[in-house]
Regions:
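Hydrophobic structural segments
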Residues: 1-267
Length: 267
């Protein structure tokens, strides 16, 4: 028996797991497009970014809810026309009665959120926050996590593990660390702001999605920097959304998007 689930119930479950007040001040997580109150959910499509192709996929799969990591509407929209992909995507969603919700820096910060998922993929133990700790509605939050590998790794073996588990062909690193790596700190997406905190926390390695040129300097033999790509670092976020929805609504239809929305090609 498929008991009907309202979109609002699903959104509430997601926000209970990662309360919106955990988000950064600059962010626009939460409802992006559409209605939640009285609408029954036909299915949820889970993704990292919402593009027109993702809305088409939702239509094809009979999903009237899209849950994304990155907000579709980040900067204020001056108008809704067809000048750029955001406007076109908003129009397409509205025309097809699709509701779009984003769980961004609130899901980055939440216990069991994006960074914990990355740590899980790396098999880290004793995973805990090492910076920016706070608590909202009984949910603990923080800016980055640190944990220990099961057994000490050489730097090149850590790089190999990242390539395998995150499906990347290239990892941007500073000079390879000559001591074994035990403590690993990480932050999905753009995490360079946590590099100093990672060093202070005693990390042997710091893994993130993107860093700029000058941020790599002056850390030789102090910490191993591994940068795997913004999209690549957060690619498993849909699995978090899926487990929250399945746990609360076992009969609800939810599927992870098959579209790779990474705009960066590695050629």
């Amino acid at each position: 028996l498929n008991r009907s689930v309202k979109i609002k119930q699903v959104v509430d479950a997601l926000e209970h797991y990662a309360p919106l007040p955990l988000q950064e001040g600059y962010d626009n997580a939460g409802l992006q497009v559409g209605l939640t109150e009285a609408v029954e959910m036909s299915g949820a499509l889970l993704c990292l970014d919402v593009t027109e192709a993702v809305v088409d996929e939702a239509i094809r799969k009979g999903c009237n809810l899209i849950v994304s990591h990155h907000p579709l509407i980040f900067r204020k929209l001056a108008r809704i026309s067809d000048e750029n992909y955001v406007q076109r995507t908003v129009r397409k969603a509205i025309k097809n009665d699709i509701t779009i919700v984003a769980m961004h820096t609130n899901m980055d910060a939440a216990a069991g959120g994006v960074n914990f998922k990355i740590a899980e993929k790396l098999g880290l133990r004793n995973v805990q926050f090492f910076a920016g700790e706070k608590e909202v509605d009984g949910v603990k939050g923080g800016e980055g996590v640190i944990g220990e590998v099961a057994e000490d790794l050489a730097a090149d073996d850590l790089v190999l593990m990242l390539k395998e588990r995150f499906g990347v062909e290239c990892v941007q690193c500073n000079q390879l660390l000559r001591r074994p790596i035990r403590k690993v700190a990480l932050c999905g997406g753009a995490g360079a702001f946590l590099l100093d905190a990672a060093i202070k926390a005693g990390a042997d390695a710091f893994i993130t999605g993107e860093m700029s040129y000058h941020e790599y300097f002056c850390h030789e033999q102090e910490i191993q920097i591994c940068v795997i790509g913004h999209y690549q670092s957060e690619q498993f976020t849909g699995e978090i959304f899926r487990s929250i929805i399945q746990e609360n609504f076992p009969d609800a239809k939810c599927c992870i998007s098959e579209i790779n929305t990474n705009p960066i090609l590695y050629l």
